[in-house]
Amino acid sequence: MKFKDLRDFVQQLEQRGELKRIQMPISPVLEMTEICDRTLRAKGPALLFEKPVGFDIPVLGNLFGTPERVAMGMGAEAVSELREIGKLLAFLKEPEPPKGLKDAWSKLPIFRKVIAMAPKVVKDAPCQEIVIEGDDVDLGMLPVQTCWPGDVAPLITWGLTVTKGPNKERQNLGIYRQQVIGRNKIIMRWLSHRGGALDFRDWCAKHPGEPYPVAVALGADPATILGAVTPVPDSLSEYAFAGLLRGSRTELIKCRGSNLQVPASAEIVLEGVIHPGEMADEGPYGDHTGYYNEVDSFPVLTVERITHRIKPIYHSTYTGRPPDEPAILGVALNEVFVPILQKQFPEIVDFYLPPEGCSYRMAVVTIKKQYPGHAKRVMLGVWSFLRQFMYTKFVIVTDDDINARDWNDVIWAITTRMDPKRDTVMIDNTPIDYLDFASPVSGLGSKMGLDVTNKWPGETTREWGRAIVKDEATTRRVDEIWTQLGID
């Protein structure tokens, strides 16, 4: 099923029993987090808080609180269908030359479909039904959550940030958290390697001292939101990818104060500029690690204009120790990653990012091992192939008789197939998540690879153990008489 905007998605979720309207007054300060956290852990519905205390705008929370709703948002009926999206992205990332005329014709519809999904610019849009400018701008109108007791201020969490580099034809979409520090000021927390930060850096180099235009869309359609967090190849824009997911071109409208283009159906849009050199201390905030992050300095966005739909919906979330909504997104997007990795490394059978590992800090990979040292090649490939795994601290590589998603299996393999000295790969001075306070230096730390495969000649001189396998005939016999035994 495809959804034209956030409201259409909300309506369809409600019809399926996947959304609950909360009519009791609930505070955005701590209370919404507590309710959403309990609901997510119970695999419950999305929540629409219709009467946030002190505000007239309803708050939508826990929208992607189950992998199934993430799949729905990407236009799939089941989480398993996300593998097909991954296969499409893998093909678009590295398309293979046609093997012949027939093969070329078979691939043509894919490229036609991609070309046909170029975004469409419109002149009028719901996101500009109401326009607030100048001194009338007040971010205090938005029911921005304060998620945890130690949070320093309200935090915008689902802002889809739109930027454009001076030397680029295409816009960048990114989701960065934004601390509210005044009626028209927010802190743009983007890390130095992220697209928005790179665009801003290039702007400052080419236009020193000039204000940099930025837009933040809140409450875009689900395909556009999820397109911004998916590993889309550089040859494909997030807006075009969202069109592929949705089955229709993404409609955009030019901002009223800049040439940036934002989703026409967004609920709320913040337009503004970053003045080079204007920085502010951001944090502390409770984060997806389960800890409060340290304070650091980031650019300040001055909001010059707020546009929104009539009776807008504010889309929000919280981040904390997994499981949280980003962790659930990680579980679903894991299925997209698998075919992309398999395209580059066909020996990979499965790839798993455990949500309790903050969704990216640990990976378990199962392979069809083909030669000594194979596991080490794969772990190095995982670290280098996709930028999404730049911060993965631990990579465990096992044979394909192990279930990567079963810790009982993985721990058994670690303790029986691995020698700590021989089978551990340590790499120092590598990029590490800025939020990882365990690293000796902010943004720089080490990585560990664990070769948990059965060892081949050349890797060991010892006779390798043979795994115990049950006798099939005996198993069938006991299956037949089991109920008669009366044990259960």
UniProtKB/Swiss-Prot annotation:
Cofactor note: Binds 1 prenylated FMN per subunit.
Pfam families: UbiD, UbiD_C, UbiD_N
UniProt main location, coarse: membrane
Full protein name: 3-octaprenyl-4-hydroxybenzoate carboxy-lyase
EC number(s) recorded for this UniProt protein: 4.1.1.98
Lineage, uppermost ranks: Bacteria, Pseudomonadati, Pseudomonadota, Gammaproteobacteria, Pseudomonadales
Cofactor(s) required, per the database record: prenylated FMN; Mn(2+)
Assembly mode: Homohexamer.
Pathway: Cofactor biosynthesis; ubiquinone biosynthesis
Positions annotated as active site in the UniProt record: D287 (proton donor)
Disulfides per UniProt: none
GO BP: any one term: ubiquinone biosynthetic process
